[in-house]
C-alpha cells in the first residue's frame, strides 16, 4: 500500500468550495466519523502556525493492517499535516514493513511523477528532485512487494 500525502483522520467532504457537513468516506454504505471543518480552527492554525486539533473519533484505525506500507509526505503540506499523520501511522502500525519519506520543498501536490508543481514558486530543480525521488521510491516499493504475488 502506498499512501501519498497521507492523513490519519477522515475529513469532512467538500461540495464545490464548501463543506458538505458529511464524511468524505463511507464504509459498507455508512458514513465514517469525520473531522469537521471549523473556520476558527483553520484561522488559528494559519495565524499562529499551530496544528488543527484532531478529533480522535475520526482517526483511521490501522491497528489490524499488516500489509507493507510506503508513506510519502511533505513537512510543508498546505492542505493537512501529512508529516504528523506519517508519525501517527508509523506509531500505530503493527505490521512488519513500513517505510516513509518526508519531503521539505514540495507541498501536498506530490502526485505527478517527474513534473514539479509550479504552484509552489520554488526552484523547480528542488521540486523535481523530490518528485523524482517519490516516484522512484514508489516503483521500488511495488517492485519489491508485488513480485511476491
Q: Where are the predicted features?
A:
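Short beta-strand/loop motif that positions the catalytic acidic residue
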Residues: 65-66, 71-77, 103
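Active-site nucleophile elbow and catalytic-triad environment of alpha/beta-hydrolase enzymes
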Residues: 45-61, 75
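Histidine-bearing beta->alpha loop at or near hydrolase active sites
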Residues: 75, 103-110, 114-118
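Catalytic active-site module of serine/aspartate enzymes centered on a nucleophile-bearing elbow/loop
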Residues: 116-149
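Cap/lid segment of the alpha/beta-hydrolase catalytic domain
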Residues: 14-20, 111-125
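Conserved alpha/beta-hydrolase "acid-adjacent" motif
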Residues: 78-88, 111
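Hydrolase active-site cap/lid region
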Residues: 1-48
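Conserved serine/cysteine hydrolase catalytic core
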Residues: 58-70, 93, 97
Amino acid at each position: 500500500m502506498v499512501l501519498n500525502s497521507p492523513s490519519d483522520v477522515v475529513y469532512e467532504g467538500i461540495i464545490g468550495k464548501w463543506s458538505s457537513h458529511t464524511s468524505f468516506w463511507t464504509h459498507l454504505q455508512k458514513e465514517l466519523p469525520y473531522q469537521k471543518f471549523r473556520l476558527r480552527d483553520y484561522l488559528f492554525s494559519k495565524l499562529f502556525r499551530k496544528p488543527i486539533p484532531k478529533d480522535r473519533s475520526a482517526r483511521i484505525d490501522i491497528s489490524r493492517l499488516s500489509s507493507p506500507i510506503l508513506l510519502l509526505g511533505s513537512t510543508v503540506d498546505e492542505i493537512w499535516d501529512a508529516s504528523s499523520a506519517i508519525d501517527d501511522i508509523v506509531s500505530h502500525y503493527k505490521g512488519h514493513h513500513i517505510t516513509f519519506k518526508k519531503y521539505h520543498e514540495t507541498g501536498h501536490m506530490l502526485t505527478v511523477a517527474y513534473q514539479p508543481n509550479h504552484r509552489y514558486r520554488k526552484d523547480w530543480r528542488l521540486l523535481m528532485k523530490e518528485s523524482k525521488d517519490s516516484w522512484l521510491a514508489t516503483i521500488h516499493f511495488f517492485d519489491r512487494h508485488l513480485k511476491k504475488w
